[in-house]
Design a protein with these regions (language model features):
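Catalytic Zn2+-binding segment of zinc metalloproteases
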Residues: 4-20
């Protein structure tokens, strides 16, 4: 879901970081800004200013101030796009951070925009209130239904890099050139 829906479909960026990556270089920050002009990477920011992050409108909306049914509290946290510094994310955890929880509000908004623009074509125009109505109607009733609290002895990061390196490499997909009938 993280890879195919998050990256592939909604064009979201990673919300996790690796200590060894350090600060995002200026060239990458400029690339993120360009991607955002094209509608990509709506879930990360190149600034920590709550007035300027891509999800600023959600931060100002009372309907998102107390968190949502997924248990996500919107904020501005440093560490995203695999870098510890210079890129910010909207929540402490999410599908694009740990791959174990649902999508946060900025990610859900990006998914909504993509689905609606592809399904309705060029006459469709984004309406924030229509998104919020749809989003609020489809949230779980409470966070207990979607998030299982970790025990104190459980590791927070689901993907330990050293353990991942021990796994066998998967084969590349084989393309036959044949059309798949639908």
């Amino acid at each position: 879901v993280h890879e195919s829906c998050g990256h592939g479909f909604a064009k979201l960026n990673d919300e996790y970081s690796y200590e060894e990556m350090g600060a995002a270089p200026e060239g990458l920050i400029e690339q993120v800004k360009l991607m955002q002009e094209l509608g990509w990477s709506a879930n990360i920011s190149t600034t920590s200013d709550p007035e300027l992050v891509p999800w600023a409108h959600l931060l100002k909306d009372d309907r998102y101030k107390s968190g949502d049914g997924n248990g996500f509290q919107l904020t501005v946290l440093e560490g995203a796009g695999t870098y510890v510094k210079n890129l910010w994310r909207p929540t402490d955890d999410s599908m694009m951070h740990n791959n174990g929880y649902g999508f946060n509000a900025p990610s859900r908004e990006a998914i909504y925009k993509r689905v609606m623009s592809l399904s309705n074509g060029s006459p469709w125009e984004y309406d924030y209130e229509e998104f919020v109505t749809f989003d609020q109607a489809h949230l779980p009733v409470n966070s207990a239904s979607t998030r299982t609290p970790l025990r104190d002895d459980e590791q927070q990061d689901f993907f330990d890099k050293e353990e991942m390196r021990k796994l066998p490499r998967l084969h590349s997909p084989i393309f036959t050139g044949e059309r798949i009938p639908f």
